[in-house]
Structures are given as structure tokens and as C-alpha cells.
């Protein structure tokens, strides 16, 4: 591991961008059913792998977490196009989620979307490797 002691870094992205928070709430303790509700190997990880392989879709980067994933997008238009294009994996994953879960309340899902205007944010990191916006954008001292 690199020596990160005393290291202060910042991050920036050129132009406006979108921060997309998405997560799940486990309302049941049936772990296997919950993982299956969220799509298993054909769920979020599958979509993120697809987006990384297709940078023209507009995903700038993401940070995995439980239960929340932070995604950075070039624009809301890019995010919305991905969400609604039947040729991209989201539409099928979304339909399959509702088919599996239906009216069951085992697993809840949510998202929040924020438009960030160029220069109207701050991203500072202490004793950290590139993380969050620092992975999606430019990392500097």
C-alpha cells in the first residue's frame, strides 16, 4: 500500500455533472432472497460492468458501498437515456426486479439524482487513495 500519511488531495471534473445515489433497503433477513431480488449477478454489478465497457453512455465513475452506490454521470440526459433504452441492460433488470418482488416488501430500492454545476462543489481527501469524485474525475494536489 502506498504511503498516504499527510497526503491531501482534491478532485475535479470539467463541466457540469450528475451525482446519482442508488441503494437498497433490506426489509427481510432472508439474505438469499434479497440478493435474488436485486438481480444477483445480472443486477447492479452487471449494469456497472456494461457502463464501464461503454464510456459513451456517460458514466464517469462510481463508488460501491452497501447499501448505497454513488455514481458520477456526464449529464442527466446520459443517465435518463441509459435508464430508458431497451438495448441497454437497465430496462430488463428493472422489469425483472418488479417481476420478482411484486407486492412483497422484502427489498426496497431508491435513488436520488443531483445536478452539479461546474465549479460549485468541493472535493477534498486526506490520507486517501483516489476515491469517489477523485476516481471519476481529475485527482490533484
Regions found by a protein language model. Give the residues of each.
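Short S/T/G/P-rich N-terminal loop/turn motif that feeds into the first structured element of a domain
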Residues: 1-65, 81, 105-141
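Tryptophan-centric aromatic hotspots in well-structured domains and transmembrane helices
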Residues: 72-74
Amino acid at each position: 500500500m502506498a504511503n498516504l500519511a499527510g497526503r491531501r488531495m482534491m478532485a475535479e471534473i470539467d463541466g457540469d455533472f450528475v451525482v446519482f445515489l442508488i441503494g437498497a433497503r433490506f426489509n427481510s433477513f432472508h439474505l438469499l432472497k434479497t440478493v435474488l431480488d436485486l438481480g444477483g449477478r445480472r443486477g447492479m454489478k452487471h449494469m456497472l460492468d456494461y457502463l464501464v465497457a461503454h464510456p459513451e453512455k456517460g458514466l464517469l465513475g462510481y463508488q460501491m458501498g452497501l447499501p448505497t452506490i454513488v455514481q458520477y454521470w456526464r449529464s442527466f440526459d446520459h443517465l435518463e437515456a441509459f435508464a430508458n433504452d431497451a438495448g441497454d441492460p437497465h430496462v430488463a433488470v428493472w422489469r425483472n426486479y418488479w417481476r420478482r418482488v411484486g407486492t412483497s416488501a422484502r427489498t426496497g430500492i431508491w435513488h436520488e439524482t443531483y445536478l452539479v454545476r461546474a465549479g460549485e462543489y468541493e472535493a477534498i481527501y486526506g490520507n486517501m487513495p483516489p476515491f469517489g469524485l477523485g476516481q471519476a474525475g481529475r485527482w490533484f494536489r
